[in-house]
A protein has these predicted regions:
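Ankyrin repeat boundary/linker residues
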Residues: 30, 63, 96, 129, ...
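Conserved ankyrin/ankyrin-like repeat signature
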Residues: 14, 48, 80-81, 114, ...
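Ankyrin-repeat-protein effector appendages
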Residues: 2-5, 121, 154, 187, ...
Length: 443
């Protein structure tokens, strides 16, 4: 082991003495399968490398990971040692245990001269390692622009993808590298390529919140509507995560401010956010609201997540305030159910209709009452006094509405009186208002 240690540590004199005495087997390897030549090449000790080769060391001997002295020299950018070993017949068509060729290795370490040499010598420009990565994908991942340009000039497939389905553009966007992203787009990469998760470069840019790259992608016709298998598109992601600049960018490039999700068989077991509210009263379950439900607009989604500034941006852009989702819910239903007083107030000030009922014949005020949001109830009564007369928890079934014009039965009157009493106890109605409404019911 002393000879290998001497070579590894660059102790030239000791190595020379041992070699001169011919007491050393230069083919001896350590527990990793590495010879003295591996270590000398790794450190770039050219004089020792030459003595070992002259003494009979195998320039193509592979250690337990398939790495040769030439591989070690390339790994550490030992250009002179690399040149010498190749002069001595070192093979360049080797791969390590991960399947990386010398072209993969030099692309990762940004050794342009060696990349050019290996390409000239015929190494496959689109060779794959065990992860199906090409040298181009490696160069993009490590942000080596000159290497990328060299590989492309030799015909590298720009849209080759790895085992995850990621291609060069997705990798460059994921690393927030604007210059390389622009280079790839100018080289006509597929801007709407999707990986195995259904992610596009546009979605990755949205996840990163990178407005500059998002703008560049849109200018190259990236599709902002493409969704993952879970129904997440750049639009919904930006709105869900309160990325106002990105939503503004999308609106500037043609997104309809009332854009909504169409009905689909892949929707959750719950029909809507409101359904979840009703099924989880008093619980602390986390509602998975990453994807929108059928019919939900951008405004619904912003309010569902409590994003006041996003809701204001959409309203200022002309969003329809009373638009319904497929369950008949307005944005006001969402805000009331979510306990967002400021948003409720903003919606009412923008003309939200508090008298609209959903498919379950519930008003926004019903959900405020259901969850004990008394201040929101007061707001809704203030802006729409007619809601005071409606039962707070259950709506009157549609088949009974015709008979209400003639008179209510005893049970419905009793329920209405109880509801009025709740409003009185909560301080929402004064005693005088209570008496007036009571007389109306009993008339």
């Amino acid at each position: 082991m002393s000879f290998i240690i001497a070579c590894e540590e660059g102790k030239r004199k000791i190595a020379e003495i041992l070699l001169d005495k011919q007491e050393v087997d230069v083919t001896y390897t350590d527990e990793k399968g590495r010879s003295a030549l591996h270590y000398a090449a790794h450190h770039g000790y050219l004089d020792i490398v030459k003595k070992l080769v002259l003494a009979g060391a195998d320039v193509n001997y592979e250690d337990h990971q398939g790495e040769t002295p030439l591989y070690f020299a390339c790994l550490q950018r030992q250009k002179q040692t690399v040149d010498y070993l190749m002069e001595q017949g070192a093979r360049i068509d080797i791969k390590d245990y991960l399947g990386n060729s010398l072209l993969h290795l030099t692309a990762r370490t940004a050794q342009l001269a060696l990349v050019q040499h290996f390409l000239k010598e015929g190494l496959a420009v689109d060779g794959l390692n065990n992860e199906a990565q090409t040298p181009l994908l490696i160069a993009v991942a490590y942000k080596h622009r000159p290497i990328i340009q060299e590989l492309l000039s030799h015909g590298a497939q720009i849209d080759a993808s790895d085992k995850s389905g990621d291609h060069s553009l997705i990798l460059s966007v994921r690393s927030n590298n604007l210059p390389i992203t622009q280079l790839l787009l100018e080289a006509n990469t597929s801007v709407n390529h999707t990986n195995d998760q259904g992610e596009t470069a546009m979605l990755v840019a949205s996840i990163n919140g990178n407005r500059m790259i998002s703008k560049l992608l849109i200018e190259h016709h990236a599709d902002m509507f493409l969704s993952t298998k879970e129904g997440i598109s750049p639009i919904w992601y930006a709105c869900t995560h309160n990325q106002k600049e990105l939503v503004s960018l999308f609106l500037d490039h043609g997104l309809d401010v009332d854009y909504s999700k169409p009905a689909a068989s892949t929707d959750s077991e719950f029909g809507s956010f409101i359904d979840w509210v009703e099924n989880n009263q008093g619980k602390k379950n986390n509602f998975n609201t990453a994807a929108p439900y059928a019919g939900e607009t951008l405004l619904h989604v912003a309010i569902k997540h409590g994003h006041t500034a996003m809701a204001k941006l959409l309203l200022d852009a002309g969003a329809s305030i009373n638009k319904l989702d497929d369950s008949g819910n307005t944005a006001l239903h969402f805000a009331a159910a979510n306990g967002k007083k400021d948003i409720v107030k903003m919606l009412l000030e923008h003309g939200a209709d508090a008298t609209l009922i959903n498919n379950r014949e519930q008003l926004a005020i019903d959900y405020a009452n259901m969850n004990g949001f008394n201040e929101i109830t007061a707001l809704l009564v203030e802006y729409s006094p007619t809601t005071k007369n409606k039962p707070s928890l259950k709506a009157v079934p549609a088949k009974e509405k015709a008979s209400e014009s003639i008179g209510q039965d005893i049970s419905s009157k009793k329920q209405a009186l109880l509801d009025l009493k709740e409003l009185l106890d909560a301080g929402i109605l004064t005693q005088e208002e209570f008496e007036v409404e009571k007389k109306k019911l009993l008339a």
